[in-house]
Amino acid sequence: DLIHEVGFPKGVFNLVNGDGRGVGTYLTKHPDIDLVSFTGSTRAGREILRNAADGLKKVSLELGGKGGNIIFSDADKDAVERGVRSVMLNSGQSCDAPTRMIVQREIYDEAVKKAAEVISSIAISAPSEQGDHIGPVVNQKQYDYIQGLIQKGVDEGASLIVGGTGRPNCLLYTSDAADEF
């Protein structure tokens, strides 16, 4: 409704809801679709490119996320806190979340301590509750994926500085942070 209220002609903006394998495949292969713009996983991006290739469609992809915060010793004193809080938005489920923090060695220990303090201060609760907190992840599959990533980090040599196991009964996970690995 808002699109039409601001004056866009019908057909200029179309929003199609559905799953990637069904609706996404149909749209990316359809001969009347000239351009596909997608933000999401690298796996899905590869599939879109394959589907769009036969029709020589224009494709714009924003894939994978995993942006990094690079923090040097002369950075703003609040850079670590802002970086941690940015990754926690939307319960950490934003494709543009800065999920890595690359810190100059001279301030590494201080940054780890600050990150742990900030993470420890973030409440975790149900989204129906009022207040400043993060809520559950979207579903069991995402919860299991996150738990697997945490375990992979530990298996590869990272040490958890905050957090631990999640709360599978309500798909909540503790806010984890690991040191370099």
Label every model-predicted segment.
Residues D1-G24:
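PLP-dependent aminotransferase-like
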Residues K29-H30, L35, S41-S175:
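ALDH superfamily catalytic-core signature
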Residues D176-F181:
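A short, hydrophobic C-terminal helix/tail in secreted or cell-surface proteins
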